[in-house]
């Protein structure tokens, strides 16, 4: 007897399903349309550079985790990334490069020497006939043993208010990650987007009730 193939949901495909179940069916089940690929441009590569820089920073020894070394990792990642091919002038490259250094100075001031419990952590679990999976940028461990999820954002922060449908959509990714991690016998008490440019945390407190939107 052939084993039943379980349907897989990432936070992105889950978002598609919640926004429009028909669209989800056409793309992921009937495969009538190709999944939309992200457009590769300087901003997409820039976001990857920032994420990679933060990850590599914590692979350094504690005594080497200075802001100067953080900047150096960024510059080396920039050179290797191929991002220069997307700029029309050196001035454009300089402007975005300086923005990156500013973002990383915010990051250093907010996180500094605080070593994350996990970075780029992949997780998946089975829920009845479904598999949920995702990858978290950062997980911090509190003294009481609880976990805080942090998802890095290089885009601009925008306020959508509280207790409305748009807020629920915006924070669905955080709730998805927290719900999935808690299902793996962890205790997540909060999940945050960290916006580099504004040095701002957008946080939701997590409990089982918070997962009802899923």
Locations of regions flagged by a protein language model:
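Short, compositionally biased low-complexity segments
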Residues: 18-29, 49, 65-83, 183-196
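A non-catalytic, helix-rich entry segment at domain boundaries
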Residues: 53-120
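Mg2+/Mn2+-dependent nuclease catalytic core
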Residues: 121-214
């Amino acid at each position: 007897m052939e084993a039943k193939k379980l349907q897989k949901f990432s936070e992105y495909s889950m978002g598609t399903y919640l926004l429009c179940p028909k669209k989800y069916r056409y793309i992921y089940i009937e495969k009538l349309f190709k999944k939309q690929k992200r457009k590769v441009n300087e901003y997409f590569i820039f976001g990857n550079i920032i994420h990679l820089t933060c990850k590599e920073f914590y692979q350094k020894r504690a005594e080497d985790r200075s802001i100067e070394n953080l900047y150096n990792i960024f510059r080396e990642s920039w050179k290797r990334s191929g991002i220069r091919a997307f700029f029309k002038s050196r001035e454009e490259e300089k402007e975005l490069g300086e923005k990156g250094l500013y973002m990383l100075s915010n990051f250093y001031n907010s996180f500094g020497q605080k070593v994350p419990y996990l970075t780029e952590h992949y997780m998946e679990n089975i829920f009845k006939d479904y598999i949920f999976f995702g990858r978290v940028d950062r997980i911090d461990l509190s003294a009481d043993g609880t976990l805080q999820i942090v998802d890095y954002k290089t885009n601009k922060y925008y306020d959508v208010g509280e207790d409305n449908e748009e807020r629920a959509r915006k924070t669905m990714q955080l709730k998805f990650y927290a719900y999935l991690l808690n299902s793996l016998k962890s205790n997540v008490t909060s999940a945050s987007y960290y916006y580099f440019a504004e040095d701002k945390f957008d946080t939701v407190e997590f409990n089982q009730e918070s997962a009802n939107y899923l």
